[in-house]
UniProtKB/Swiss-Prot annotation:
This protein's name: 4-hydroxy-3-methylbut-2-enyl diphosphate reductase
Alphabetical list of Pfam families matching this protein: LYTB
Reactions accelerated catalytically: isopentenyl diphosphate + 2 oxidized [2Fe-2S]-[ferredoxin] + H2O = (2E)-4-hydroxy-3-methylbut-2-enyl diphosphate + 2 reduced [2Fe-2S]-[ferredoxin] + 2 H(+); dimethylallyl diphosphate + 2 oxidized [2Fe-2S]-[ferredoxin] + H2O = (2E)-4-hydroxy-3-methylbut-2-enyl diphosphate + 2 reduced [2Fe-2S]-[ferredoxin] + 2 H(+)
Role of this protein: Catalyzes the conversion of 1-hydroxy-2-methyl-2-(E)-butenyl 4-diphosphate (HMBPP) into a mixture of isopentenyl diphosphate (IPP) and dimethylallyl diphosphate (DMAPP). Acts in the terminal step of the DOXP/MEP pathway for isoprenoid precursor biosynthesis.
Active site: 135 (proton donor)
Gene designation per UniProt: ispH
Broad enzyme group: oxidoreductase
Entry annotated with the keyword DNA-binding: no
Cofactor note: Binds 1 [4Fe-4S] cluster per subunit.
Keyword Iron-sulfur recorded: yes
Cofactor list: [4Fe-4S] cluster
Length: 323
C-alpha cells in the first residue's frame, strides 16, 4: 500500500470501507424524511445513531431527541432509533396513541427475532454485549426471562445455567469480532452443545471496518478513528488498531480534537471512521493532516459494500439522500 509521488517519508492511509453503513443511512434518512413529510417537530427516542454531529444536524432541522417516551407530548410523532427498542416501549407508545416510525436497523431486528425464537423453544440465551447499550436493552426486552448478559470472556465462568435446558448465544451487532469469538469459544468449552445463531449477529459493516483496520494498522505509527465516544463500533476500531500492530490509536469526533503531541515523531498515519460517521468529518481529518505535511491519503478498498435497506413503510413513497 505505497504512497506514490510523495517526496517525504510521511505516509497517510485511509481505510475502506469506513463510515456510514446501510442501517445508519436508513435511520438518518428516516428522520430527514419524517421532517419533510410531517413537519417539525419529530421526536426521536434516544440518539438516532451514536454520532454527535449527526444528532446536532438533525436537531437543527427540527428533530427533538428524548431519552424516554414520557418526554413526548400526546399525539406526537416519535421515531425509534437504529439500535431498536423493546416490546415494552412499543406497547407504551401504542397505549398512549403516539404515532411511531421504527428506524431499527434490520440487522438488529434479526437478532430480536432470533431471541424470540429461542425463547419460544425454552432455550437459555447468552447475549454477548455491553450493559446499558440501547441495542442490548431492546434485545433483552424480547425475552427477559431467557436472556443472560455476557460482557467479557471472563464473565463466562460465573454463569449459572440449567444443565437440563439448551443454551444458545446471540450478540450485539457492533462488537469486536475477535473478542466475541473468544467469548463464544469459552462458552462452548463449558457447554459443548451450545447453539449458534442462524447467521452472524455482528453486522457486515462492523466486520468489514474491523478487517480494513487490521489490514492497515501494522504499517501505522498512529491510527485515528473518527467517531463519537458513545459509539460502540468506533471504540472497537481503536481496540482493533492497537491489537493489530498500530503503535498508537485515538478516537476523535472531528479534526479539532486531534492533539499536536499525537503527531510528534509520527511518519505513518492511518484514518478510519465508525459506522455512523459522515464522510465530511473524515475529510476534515485528512485535510488537517495534509496541512501539517502529510501527503494525500492512499486508499485501499478491502471490500465494496452495496447493501441498502428500504425505508420504513410510512416513508417509502419518496426518498431523500442522506447528507
Amino acid at each position: 500500500m505505497a504512497v506514490t509521488g510523495a517526496c517525504t517519508n510521511k505516509k497517510l492511509y485511509l481505510a475502506a470501507p469506513r463510515g456510514y453503513c446501510a442501517g445508519v443511512d436508513r435511520a438518518v434518512v428516516t428522520v430527514e424524511k419524517a421532517l419533510e413529510v410531517y413537519g417539525a417537530p419529530v421526536y426521536v427516542r434516544k440518539q438516532i445513531v451514536h454520532n454527535r454531529h449527526v444528532v446536532e444536524t438533525l436537531e437543527g432541522r427540527g428533530a427533538i431527541f428524548v431519552d424516554e417516551l414520557d418526554e413526548v407530548p400526546d399525539d406526537a410523532l416519535v421515531v425509534f432509533s437504529a439500535h431498536g427498542v423493546s416490546p415494552q416501549v412499543k406497547k407504551e407508545a401504542t397505549d398512549r396513541g403516539l404515532r411511531t416510525i421504527d428506524a431499527t436497523c434490520p440487522l438488529v431486528t434479526k437478532v430480536h427475532h432470533e431471541a424470540k425464537r429461542f425463547a419460544n423453544q425454552d432455550t437459555q440465551i447468552l447475549l454477548i454485549g455491553h450493559a446499558g447499550h440501547e441495542e442490548v436493552e431492546g434485545t433483552t426486552g424480547e425475552a427477559p426471562e431467557n436472556i443472560t448478559l455476557v460482557q467479557t470472556p471472563a464473565d463466562v465462568d460465573g454463569l449459572a445455567l440449567d444443565r437440563d435446558r439448551p443454551v444458545a448465544w446471540l450478540s450485539q451487532t457492533t462488537l469486536s469480532v475477535d473478542e466475541t469469538v473468544e467469548t463464544v469459544d469459552r462458552i462452548r468449552d463449558l457447554h459443548p452443545q451450545l447453539i449458534d445463531p442462524p447467521s452472524d449477529d455482528i453486522c457486515y459493516a462492523t466486520q468489514n471496518r474491523q478487517h480494513a483496520v487490521k489490514q492497515m494498522a501494522p504499517q501505522c505509527d498512529l491510527v485515528i478513528v473518527v467517531g463519537s465516544k458513545n459509539s460502540s463500533n468506533t471504540g472497537r476500531l481503536v481496540e482493533v488498531a492497537l491489537e493489530s500492530g498500530a503503535k498508537a490509536s485515538y478516537r476523535v469526533d472531528n479534526a479539532g480534537e486531534i492533539e499536536e503531541t499525537w503527531l510528534d515523531g509520527v511518519s505513518t498515519i492511518g484514518v478510519t471512521s465508525g459506522a455512523s460517521v459522515p464522510e465530511a468529518l473524515v475529510q476534515g481529518v485528512i485535510d488537517l493532516l495534509i496541512s501539517k505535511g502529510w501527503p494525500p491519503a492512499e486508499e485501499e478498498t478491502l471490500i465494496e459494500e452495496s447493501l441498502s435497506f428500504a425505508l420504513p413503510p410510512q416513508l417509502r413513497k419518496r426518498r431523500t439522500t442522506a447528507k
